[in-house]
Amino acid sequence: HKYVVNTKPYYFYYHRGNSITTSTFSKRDFNYIEIYTKFSRYVEEHYPDLHEEMFFRLSYAYFFIFDKLLHVDGYQKLEEYKVVCDYLKQNALKIARNQIFQKGRRLAALFLKVNVRLYRFVMLANERKTKQIH
């Protein structure tokens, strides 16, 4: 098997509505975390020097799913919510120190550590701002 991990931002995405990345949460989306968890174990075992990059990728997968969950009415009641939220809160300081994450995402991790509602408020405000740009 051959894997390549790269975290350098070579380009910017324009997110279309109703694409896979912008659709609402479904239980299938949790596969994204499961895949990156398996990938992370492999990388940690065979390429431990890529620990920071792999932590970034795995944590990003959790953020991706968490952001989707926060758009669901009654998200607090979903079983996936607790798993994802717990991971991000437990790793918030490590995320905040990881220089691969953009500054905004590092700050968001700290907001989440303080309060999920604060994180959600900032996330939704950022989404509204981004939609105005496009």
Task: Provide a role label for each language-model segment.
Residues 3-35, 72:
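Nucleotide-sugar-dependent glycosyltransferase catalytic core
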Residues 4-6, 53, 96-98:
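General small-molecule cofactor/ligand-binding pocket signal
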Residues 22-23, 48-49, 75:
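Short, surface-exposed loop/turn segments at secondary-structure junctions
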Residues 30-34, 49-57, 79:
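Residues within HEAT/ARM-like alpha-solenoid scaffolds
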Residues 35-38, 61:
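Amphipathic, well-ordered alpha-helical segments in soluble domains
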Residues 40, 44-47:
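A conserved position within tetratricopeptide repeats
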Residues 45, 71-134:
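Membrane-interface aromatic/basic loop that binds lipid-linked glycans or pyrophosphate carriers
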Residues 55-68:
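Amphipathic alpha-helical repeat scaffolds of TPR domains
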